């Protein structure tokens, strides 16, 4: 009833992913990747699927689509979900945990990960506790990714947020977003660039 249609991520620097044999010349260009996505999107829409957020599609009766309509759609590290997840525990090497107020990443090699687990240690290598500004930015990013719009509270602003607003002016000129006061809406034309917004 739902599927994720992700673009290939070329990460040859990550050990063990088997991508070292490819180089940039073996891969489709950004324009070719976009065409592939648009062709796939068209085929999925012909089968009755509706685009939900970025890279996700669902049938109309699926609760993922219903949560989009009801403005309850949420996104976490795994993709879009119909329920707000405030705790995700990452299991395995390099996995990322998210407690809403903090992120933690596990050690990146199998050997070190296994050793720490066998010794009863938590295999976290790094983390970040979100401050109030981080949480504000996170909320706006989620609003844009899930609802294609967000409204900034002028009483809860800070310089970086105002700078982001200025950077969006070029996207507004390209008709990718509409800005009305402190409200940003991603246009249909801009939907393909949601990650960039």
Show the residue positions of the predicted features.
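Short, amphipathic alpha-helical interaction segments positioned at domain boundaries
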Residues: 189-197
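Short amphipathic alpha-helical interaction segments
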Residues: 158-173
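A short, conserved structural fragment
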Residues: 172-182
């Amino acid at each position: 009833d739902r599927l994720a249609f992700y673009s290939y991520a070329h990460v040859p620097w990550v050990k063990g992913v088997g991508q070292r044999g490819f180089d940039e010349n073996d891969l489709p260009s950004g324009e070719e990747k976009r065409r592939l996505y648009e062709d796939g999107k068209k085929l999925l829409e012909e089968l009755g699927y509706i685009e939900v957020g970025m890279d996700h599609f669902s049938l109309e009766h699926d609760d993922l689509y219903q949560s989009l309509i009801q403005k309850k759609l949420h996104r976490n590290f795994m993709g879009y979900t119909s329920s707000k997840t405030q705790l995700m525990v990452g299991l395995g090497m390099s996995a990322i945990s998210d407690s809403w107020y903090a992120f933690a990443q596990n050690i990146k090699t199998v050997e070190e990960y296994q050793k720490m687990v066998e010794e009863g240690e938590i295999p976290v290598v790094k983390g970040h506790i979100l401050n109030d500004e981080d949480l504000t930015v996170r909320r706006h990013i989620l609003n844009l990714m899930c609802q294609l719009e967000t409204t900034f509270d002028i009483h809860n602003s800070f310089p970086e947020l105002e700078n982001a607003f200025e950077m969006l002016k070029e996207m507004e000129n390209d008709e990718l977003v509409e800005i009305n006061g402190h409200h940003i809406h991603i246009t249909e034309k801009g939907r393909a660039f949601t990650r960039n917004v």
